[in-house]
């Protein structure tokens, strides 16, 4: 009987040890087309995966802040978010600010991020970087014992979906 009780206790202990689950690590992502990121993050939201921001997440990459629940995002000390106004190519081939897309982006961000952006003049063609203590005050820290492995994304002129890196690990 003691053996069965001990065995049952061991099984319950092992079962309660926090199951491994998928973790997505974002690093060195300079953004790209808004629609691509909206689709990617919609799928990620439905997956239930946790997002680790561990490096640059700029431009359309920052849509992750509005698409993924706040409690499923964590940041490392290396995390940097880059925000700017949305743009399109004008008739002459030059970048032209798109006010409607800029407003859509802005409205997707959590209120504390919108407040931070507003305090710095709003979304403009110039990049605003949120990092360090200010960013860590908004999002929970990542525990890097999650053992998330990384695969460097290939370099392309327009970043694609492979610039979000998937890894397996545990968050504690």
List PLM regions with ranges.
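N-terminal secretory signal peptides that target proteins for export/translocation
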Residues: 1-2
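Bacterial N-terminal signal peptides
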Residues: 6-15
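Generic macromolecular interface patches on structured domains
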Residues: 7, 74-75, 145
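Sec/Tat signal peptide C-region and signal peptidase I cleavage site
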Residues: 15-23
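Charged, glycine-interspersed solvent-exposed loop segments at helix/strand-loop junctions
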Residues: 23-26, 35, 39-52, 91-172
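Cleft-lining beta-strand/loop regions that shape enzyme active-site pockets
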Residues: 23-91
């Amino acid at each position: 009987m003691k053996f069965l009780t001990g065995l049952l206790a061991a099984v319950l202990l092992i079962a309660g040890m926090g199951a491994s689950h998928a973790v997505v690590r974002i690093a060195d992502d300079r953004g790209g087309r808004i629609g691509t990121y909206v689709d990617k993050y919609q799928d990620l939201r439905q997956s239930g995966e946790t997002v680790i921001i561990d490096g640059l997440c700029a431009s359309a990459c920052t849509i992750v802040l509005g698409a993924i629940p706040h409690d499923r995002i964590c940041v490392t000390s290396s995390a940097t978010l880059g925000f700017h106004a949305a743009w399109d190519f004008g008739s002459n081939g030059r970048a032209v600010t798109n006010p409607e897309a800029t407003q859509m982006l802005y409205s997707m961000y959590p209120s504390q991020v919108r407040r931070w952006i507003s305090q710095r003049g709003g979304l403009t063609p110039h990049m605003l970087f949120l990092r360090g203590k200010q960013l860590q005050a908004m999002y929970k820290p990542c525990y890097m014992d999650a053992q998330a492995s990384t695969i460097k994304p290939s370099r392309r002129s327009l970043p694609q979906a492979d610039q979000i890196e998937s890894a397996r690990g545990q968050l504690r």
